[in-house]
Amino acid sequence: MFIVNNDIPKHNNAANMSTVSSIIDAIEIVINAKMRRTGICGATETLLCHEKVINSILPDIIEKLIDQGCEIRADRNIKLLNKNINDASEKDWQTEYLDKIISIKSVNDVSDAIKHIEQYGSNHTDAIITENYKTAEIFLNEVNSAIVLHNASTQYADGGEFGMGAEMGIATGKLHARGPVGLEQLTTYKYQLRGNGQVRP
């Protein structure tokens, strides 16, 4: 799952904060998160879009996704943006497509996004794009996923990227011990990554 908040990340340029580069970064993050490798567990399957940016940044994201052969399934608010968007069903919000398909839903705020993620998410990887530090911290701390990212692609959800070597599997449960259980076996991790527009090559 992924949320584009109404506060798009801004990065310094020589003169001032550049909103244009921020929008480009946000678009590139979303495209990379979905399309870099669609068949991996870190691929974004649902995009939750803040209602305030539906008409500004989302049309560009939708156009780029469609240009790359991605099928879009969306709620009524999003569907109005492009005639090539299909209706999303209740099942779409919880589907791991592992393909060039994405579901898009509008949300009122970060709390609305978190509620959606709690109801439909896999507890694997979730990300937020925002320059608002407070909003990002709420998301990072309240979303109950193994990996949560701020301003970076969900494609970073990989053991190799965490310096763990070859990835043998993914666990999203909080308790994964088997056999004798000591203090170390009761330990679980939540990884929080803070980015600045990073996409995975």
Protein language model features and the residues they cover:
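ALDH superfamily catalytic-core signature
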Residues: M1-D99, H150
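Conserved C-terminal structural/oligomerization subdomain of aldehyde/semialdehyde dehydrogenase
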Residues: S89-P201
